[in-house]
From Swiss-Prot:
It is found in: Nucleus. The keyword Transcription applies. This is Zinc finger protein 691. Residues 1-68 are annotated as: Disordered. There is a cross-link at K81 (Glycyl lysine isopeptide (Lys-Gly) (interchain with G-Cter in SUMO2)). Signal peptide: none annotated. A zinc finger (C2H2-type) spans 83-105, 111-133, 139-161, 167-189, 195-217, 223-245, 251-273. It comes from the Eukaryota. GO terms for molecular function: DNA binding; zinc ion binding. Belongs to the krueppel C2H2-type zinc-finger protein family. The keyword Phosphoprotein applies. It comes from Mus musculus (Mouse). Keywords: DNA-binding, Isopeptide bond, Metal-binding, Nucleus, Phosphoprotein, Repeat, Transcription, Transcription regulation, Ubl conjugation, Zinc, Zinc-finger.
Length: 283
């Protein structure tokens, strides 16, 4: 059985230019790199320090660990360091690039796409891949066929169909479909409302709500339906009205199948089913 030195294959630095001779490391720790032929030293140093070999010779040392470990080559005169892959001999100027390269040999893919589970060896490749999901709409609502890019967006949308409002304000009891909407609402209790109506004194936390309310005093109705000429002060009511002309009823009751043009009408309707259920429970 041979010694460790005999078992370990020689690690070669990449050749630089014509006539350069390969250098080798004997595998021992803190070993000095020696040329197979004496005149090859200038070619090695040209690769380490630039395109032109220095006039004076420098010592270049190599630190080697166990078999398969990367080797560190350094020049004491310039403090320049190169990290070499023990598998293929390719060199890198920092350990981060070396580790990324070594995943080619190990097959390691630590970066996983949260949407489809596909794995990648580089984080940049994963980011590039995830943009595909942002451009596609894979998640379709079975109720109204509207599509979404993210599963979480579909879940939020489906709560509108079901009339579910799982996020409840612990101060006033008002419920919301999204936690972010609840957070915005909750600030209205903690912060003084900056928008106060000079007509009735009612206060509002945002300018859009204040504007809708203020139009009830002024009588302004800026949203006009081109089909029938009816006007509205609130854009959401205007949008719901337009759906009546188009025959759209995207809000469907999952209990009886009835459709509605407004989510508020669906919620009001579903309460009738809850009342029926209460009567059955007590019968």
């Amino acid at each position: 059985m041979g010694s460790e030195k005999e078992q370990r294959p020689e690690a070669h630095l990449p050749e630089e230019g014509e006539g350069a001779k390969p250098w080798r490391v004997d595998g021992s720790k803190d070993s000095q790199i020696t040329p197979r032929e004496d005149h090859g030293q200038e070619s090695l140093l040209a690769g380490l320090h630039g395109t032109h070999p220095p006039k004076t010779r420098q010592k270049v040392t190599a630190q080697a660990g166990g078999p398969g470990d990367p080797m560190l080559f350094s020049s004491p005169e310039t403090d320049e360091k190169l990290f070499i892959c023990a598998q293929c001999g390719k060199t890198f100027n920092n350990t981060s690039n070396l580790r990324t390269h070594q995943r080619i040999h190990t097959g390691e893919k630590p970066y996983k796409c949260s949407e489809c589970g596909k794995s990648f060896s580089r984080s940049s490749n994963r980011i590039r891949h995830e943009r595909i999901h942002l451009e596609e709409k894979h998640y379709q609502c079975a109720k109204c066929q509207e599509s979404f890019r993210r599963r979480s967006d579909l879940t939020t949308h489906q709560q509108d169909h079901l009339g579910q409002r799982p996020y409840r304000c612990d101060i006033c009891g008002k419920s919301f479909t999204q936690s972010s909407t609840l957070a915005v609402h909750h600030r209205t209790h903690l912060e003084p409302a900056p928008y106060i109506c000079c007509e009735c004194g009612k206060s509002f936390s945002n300018s859009s709500s204040f504007g809708v309310h203020h139009r009830t005093h002024t009588g302004e109705r800026p949203y006009e339906c081109t089909e029938c000429g009816r006007t509205f002060s609130d854009i959401s009511n205007f949008g719901a009205h337009q759906r009546t002309h188009r025959g759209e009823k995207p809000y469907r009751c999952t209990l009886c199948g009835k459709h509605f043009s407004r989510s508020s009408n669906l919620i009001r309707h579903q309460k009738t089913h809850l009342g029926e259920q209460d009567e059955k429970d007590f019968s």
